[in-house]
From Swiss-Prot:
Repeat (LRR) residue spans along the chain: 127-155, 178-203, 207-225, 278-302, 332-357, 402-427, 447-465
Keyword Repeat in record: yes
Keyword terms, alphabetized: Leucine-rich repeat, Repeat
Domain (F-box): residue spans on this chain: 27-73
Gene3D superfamilies found in the cross-reference section: 1.20.1280.50, Ribonuclease Inhibitor
Protein name stated in the entry: Putative F-box/LRR-repeat protein At3g28410
Name of one Pfam family that matches: F-box
Length: 465
């Protein structure tokens, strides 16, 4: 009996030793990985953490020094010795976030020169100003690189004014955020990017006219002008295929987008529209749509739809569109319905509609009367089935009300879009009372009936928004 217990004890001890050995072997397996794989793993963490792996073993001591991806974050008053230890001949990706003060200006320049000397391909620079002087300027070497393919610059409203001829011959993707760029500087930058394919301008100031007519390879343009002091901008972009334009208080003018095939328009309204701003936005929105001669894919947000509803109320003529795929982002509220209806009617070739339900930020019906017009009174007779923005929040979570609202919207679409082949509706969680079986059964039964009776494929999906 005692011998059997002793034998079982030895077997358990042996299994324990084998388990420990497997763990050790697993650790050794990581150590024996090729450098390329280890470099790839380290590229997903900040460089200061990657440097700490040098204490793991002799094998890891110099691994980080040859990692082709660097992610440097230096805060106020910090110094860094990475430059002296780094040995990789080429940097594929370099991210620099730095707090600027009187002592760190030379460090910013040194890091930029260091990255460019290693033929960096993807460069991201984020400089935050703690001097409050806004006087920092990139060194001339920053504007001269034959290796850069992707550049992302975020400044704290510094001037980005090159004092030399820009030469980014390999650059394909350029993103500029919170920069002050006058027209002549932008012209200099564009002239130095002969193969540029994508341009993003996020909250950049001083730019009044963006002329991309001499950038034949540029296909994607993304402009975000939510900041009030950005000012108006005229866009000349005859070669782009895709445009995303987001703006707030200052409308933009589209001069030429003759090759455009996909557009995404949105207004971020931080205040209720006054009669003056409503008139200005209405004129601008209709002028933009009239420029979209060849647009096949169009995405619009809630404020654009409300402005189009006002235009419909005023009897303003709408342009006829060639849109085949329309995406709208809004709620099922009364103020957007006339705008959606007119978009559908004036898109005779529409094949697909996608709706994403999002919480409405501002409702036109809550503002003061517009030159004697009372939108709520005018729309109530034709859109009474749809609630106002105040009424809809009383309905949220009521499954029966949600079902009727979704059915009303789908019927509205089917009446106004005669060529429609597919409709996709993404319902946010705010429309439900946590009853998933109800969502799957009652709503899906209703959708199946509408789809069959109208010969249109209808999909209803539940989103997390």
């Amino acid at each position: 009996m005692a011998k059997r217990r002793e034998k079982r004890g030895r077997r358990r001890q042996h299994r324990s030793h084998r388990k420990i050995q497997r763990i050790i072997d697993g650790a050794d397996f990581i150590n024996y990985m090729p450098d390329d794989i280890l470099h790839h793993i380290l590229s997903f963490i900040p460089t200061d953490l990657a440097m700490r792996t040098s204490v793991l073993s002799r094998r890891w001591r110099h691994v980080w020094c040859e990692t082709p991806c660097l992610d440097i974050k230096l805060k106020h008053g910090e110094t860094n010795q990475t430059l002296t230890s780094y040995t990789a001949p080429i940097i594929t990706s370099f991210k620099l976030v730095m707090d600027l003060n009187d002592n760190t200006v030379p460090q910013v320049d040194s890091w930029i020169e260091f990255a460019l000397s290693r033929n960096v391909q993807n460069l991201s620079v984020f400089v935050r100003d703690f001097t409050y002087t806004k006087t920092y300027r990139f060194p001339d070497i920053f504007y001269i690189s034959s290796s850069l393919k992707q550049l992302d610059v975020t400044l704290d409203f510094f001037d980005m004014i090159p004092t030399c001829a820009v030469s980014w011959k390999s650059l394909r993707n350029l993103t500029l955020r919170f920069c002050q760029i006058p027209d002549e500087s932008m012209h200099n930058i564009l002239s130095g990017c002969p193969i540029l394919e994508s341009l993003t301008l996020d909250t950049c100031r001083l730019l009044e006219r963006l002329d991309l007519s001499k950038s034949p390879n540029l296909r994607r343009l993304d402009i975000n002008r939510q900041y009030r002091r950005t000012g108006p901008i005229a866009i000349v972009a005859p070669h782009i295929y895709y445009l995303r334009l987001t703006y707030s208080s200052t409308p933009s003018t589209i001069v030429d987008v003759s090759s455009l095939s996909e557009a995404n328009l949105n207004i971020i309204s931080d205040r209720l529209l006054s009669p003056l701003t409503a008139d200005r936005y209405q004129t601008m929105a209709l002028e933009m749509l009239s420029k979209f001669h060849n647009v096949k894919r169009l995405t619009v947000g809630e404020t654009i739809l409300q402005i189009l509803s006002l235009a419909e109320l005023r009897g303003v003529p709408f342009p006829t569109l060639k849109v085949q795929t329309l995406t709208v982002k809004t709620e099922f509220v009364r103020s957007v319905i006339p705008g959606i209806s007119r978009l559908l009617q004036n898109s005779p070739g529409l094949k697909k509609l996608t709706l994403h339900t999002l919480q409405l930020s501002h409702d036109i019906m809550e503002m003061h009367p517009l030159k004697g017009l009372y939108p709520d009174q005018c729309w109530r007779s034709t859109c009474e089935v749809f609630p106002t923005s105040k009424e809809i929040y009383k309905m949220l979570g009521c499954n029966d009300a949600t079902s009727k609202l979704v059915a009303s919207f789908m019927n509205l679409v089917l009446r106004n879009a005669k060529t429609l082949e597919r409709m996709v509706v993404w319902l946010g969680g705010i429309y439900f009372n946590g009853d998933a079986p109800w969502f799957e059964e009652e709503l899906f039964d209703m959708v199946e009936t509408l789809s069959h009776n109208n010969n249109v494929s209808i999909l209803l999906k539940q989103s997390n928004c």
